[in-house]
Each structure stands twice: as C-alpha cells, then as structure tokens.
Amino acid sequence: GCCGAFACRFGCTPCC
C-alpha cells in the first residue's frame, strides 16, 4: 500500500 504524505509527494494516489 501507499500511505503517508511522502507517498503523495511521490505521485502515489489515492492518498490515505
């Protein structure tokens, strides 16, 4: 899974 602010910054969506 891709969760966390760092994940969002890496273009991982949707963000948890």
From Swiss-Prot:
PTM notes: Contains 3 disulfide bonds.
Superkingdom per UniProt: Eukaryota
GO MF annotations in UniProt: toxin activity
Sequence similarity: Belongs to the conotoxin M superfamily.
Tissue: Expressed by the venom duct. Is present in all duct parts with a highest content in part 2 (proximal of the venom bulb) and then decreases in concentration toward the end of the duct.
GO CC, any one term: extracellular region
Subcellular location: Secreted
Protein name in the entry: Conotoxin tx3d
Sorted UniProt keywords: Disulfide bond, Secreted, Toxin
Notes on the domains: The cysteine framework is III (CC-C-C-CC).
Upper classification of the organism: Eukaryota, Metazoa, Spiralia, Lophotrochozoa, Mollusca
Disulfide cross-links: 2-16, 3-12, 8-15
